[in-house]
């Protein structure tokens, strides 16, 4: 499937499938670099996977019984226990919101990553030919805007709890007097600490984006370079391996969030 007016070449196929449905592509904004150039497909599928997460957990919570649990309830309980154990082992403060935050991040990122296993043309083809939607990327976590938005959300919480727990003065002292506790080293300390602080959301968001984008490119290459009846030969082995990537990236994002929240709750004199 190629963009309108573009020859069905491997390069055109790849370019088409790496293009988001955006307000610029729909002619709603004049410039592609505009702040209001929104990736509609990424937002839709991130909301869609979020609703799936909420729907499953809400349904299980309503039907939870003290007797023999069903398979879905067992799966949900295992996930909750897994996340709770990691929070207990890693987070050393007292905040009842950290466990729900970690659970939400793990499940949401996992579901967004899981969209990478949907066959390349399964949704874009009918979207273009039946609904007239020219572009459609179904993996939200392969969009740097989504991953960086989540990372910046975690960063905002980190700053908020750092100031709340340590006080504005304590937070400032932590930046100015660490690692060298002398006033003459304040400029050097600030340089190190500010760069380290800003690197946290950048690495958090870019790590997830890089891994998922690379996985998506491999699937697209398999679809572009092979005839349709042989695509499974290239995609299946990668899909089996990619299941591990999907899980690991969701776990890493969750664990780093817990670690950052724990650092934010540490006393400034710790």
UniProtKB/Swiss-Prot annotation:
F-type ATPases have 2 components, CF(1) - the catalytic core - and CF(0) - the membrane proton channel. CF(1) has five subunits: alpha(3), beta(3), gamma(1), delta(1), epsilon(1). CF(0) has three main subunits: a(1), b(2) and c(9-12). The alpha and beta chains form an alternating ring which encloses part of the gamma chain. CF(1) is attached to CF(0) by a central stalk formed by the gamma and epsilon chains, while a peripheral stalk is formed by the delta and b chains. Key component of the proton channel; it plays a direct role in the translocation of protons across the membrane. The gene is atpB. CDD domains: ATP-synt_Fo_a_6. This is ATP synthase subunit a. SUPFAM superfamilies: F1F0 ATP synthase subunit A (SSF81336). The lineage of its organism: Bacteria, Pseudomonadati, Pseudomonadota, Gammaproteobacteria, Vibrionales. GO terms for molecular function: proton-transporting ATP synthase activity, rotational mechanism. One of its GO terms (cellular component) is plasma membrane. Keywords: ATP synthesis, Cell inner membrane, Cell membrane, CF(0), Hydrogen ion transport, Ion transport, Membrane, Transmembrane, Transmembrane helix, Transport.
